[in-house]
Amino acid sequence: MVKYISILGSTGSIGTSALDVVSAHPEHFKIVGLTANYNIELLEQQIKTFQPRIVSVATKELADTLRTRISTNTKITYGTDGLIAVATHPNSNLVLSSVVGVSGLLPTIEALKAKKDIAIANKETLVAAGHIVTELAKQNGCRLIPVDSEHSAIFQCLNGENNKEIDKLIVTASGGAFRDKTREEMKTLQAKDALKHPNWLMGAKLTIDSATLMNKGFEVMEARWLFDIPYEKINVMIHKESIIHSLVEFIDGSVIAQLGAPDMRMPIQYAFHYPTRLPSSYEKLNLLEIGSLHFEKPDLEKFPCLQYAYECGKIGGITPAVLNAANEIANALFLKNEIAFFDIEKTIYKTVEAHHNVKDPSLDAILEADQWARQYANQLLIKKS
């Protein structure tokens, strides 16, 4: 069966890896739609190669520019409406959500309403609105297939298993670019230092989130919704080699782990062709060459963002959306070298402390909380500067 795929965020690291997978298996995958933010040069090349029916970019100006540069019959749209148009295109049956941040929420929700299966790589969608997204998927008979290597690993480990027999999920973490630094050393580190991830090729925002361990916190929150497991049963373990992508421990003491070379094309290909596997030419795992694997507990005093994620997830309501929004603002300013590394965690803490929670929020309440938190975090950082 051919999968007809729309990719939200086709010019980012996940999107380009996904298109590598499509190119490797053209008999199995066809591209229907693509979206980019501002990188229309790369999008133009992708349009020529994959000839999608529809694409979307950030602004009308970029859309107008792109129209002058392509000769295909591809429809060109823009903005949030454009994202939604790509996500809900009638010719697609699978949507890869790989845009960065909460901007992936609305198109994912609309895609589910249109009865599309979702290959989900956008963490923030489940962080901010996990209860809404998972319920919509159930109502519409849609599959949420994880793309993150950690969640793909758990998904594969649980294949054919009974969720009631799970004792705990163990999500592995590389530890990020600053894993071997002391708090004192981290005080003066800049974005350029954080962007050197030890194991994975990732976008800038995600690499900073990895350095603070907020990325791992988001993955814990994501796992709670993807697998319907309480936070008390989700553990994090530092594993510097990034060979074991996650583990599941069962009530009888048995542990199943999923291993593989750190290459995002593998979980993407698994998600695209689920429930069956395809051959690949990607690097194969050789444990004899690796020799040994190492594990340790995360240091929550050194990396408090992971603890914040657990606490906000347990509180629920709009609190996770507030956490996410404050992190997005602080992360972006750190990338511009406008704030210090520790200002990220301080901004998140103060913003979460200042908000008033709403239990079982509607989508509108979540979006309002997102906007409030962005403004509050911005004001905190403006006052600081």
Swiss-Prot record:
InterPro entries: DXP_reductoisomerase (IPR003821), DXP_reductoisomerase_C (IPR013644), DXP_reductoisomerase_N (IPR013512), DXPR_C (IPR026877), DXPR_C_sf (IPR036169), NAD(P)-bd_dom_sf (IPR036291). It catalyses: 2-C-methyl-D-erythritol 4-phosphate + NADP(+) = 1-deoxy-D-xylulose 5-phosphate + NADPH + H(+). NADPH binds at residues 11-14, 39, 122, 124, 203. GO terms for molecular function: 1-deoxy-D-xylulose-5-phosphate reductoisomerase activity; manganese ion binding; NADPH binding. Keywords: Isoprene biosynthesis, Manganese, Metal-binding, NADP, Oxidoreductase. Its EC number is 1.1.1.267. 1-deoxy-D-xylulose 5-phosphate binds at residues 123, 149-150, 174, 197, 210, 215-216, 219. GO terms for biological process: isopentenyl diphosphate biosynthetic process, methylerythritol 4-phosphate pathway involved in terpenoid biosynthetic process. Its cofactor is Mg(2+); Mn(2+). Mn(2+) binds at residues 148, 150, 219. It holds the Pfam family DXP_redisom_C. It comes from the Bacteria. Belongs to the DXR family. PANTHER family: 1-DEOXY-D-XYLULOSE 5-PHOSPHATE REDUCTOISOMERASE, 1-DEOXY-D-XYLULOSE 5-PHOSPHATE REDUCTOISOMERASE, CHLOROPLASTIC. Catalyzes the NADPH-dependent rearrangement and reduction of 1-deoxy-D-xylulose-5-phosphate (DXP) to 2-C-methyl-D-erythritol 4-phosphate (MEP). This is 1-deoxy-D-xylulose 5-phosphate reductoisomerase 1. It comes from Bacillus anthracis. The gene is dxr1.
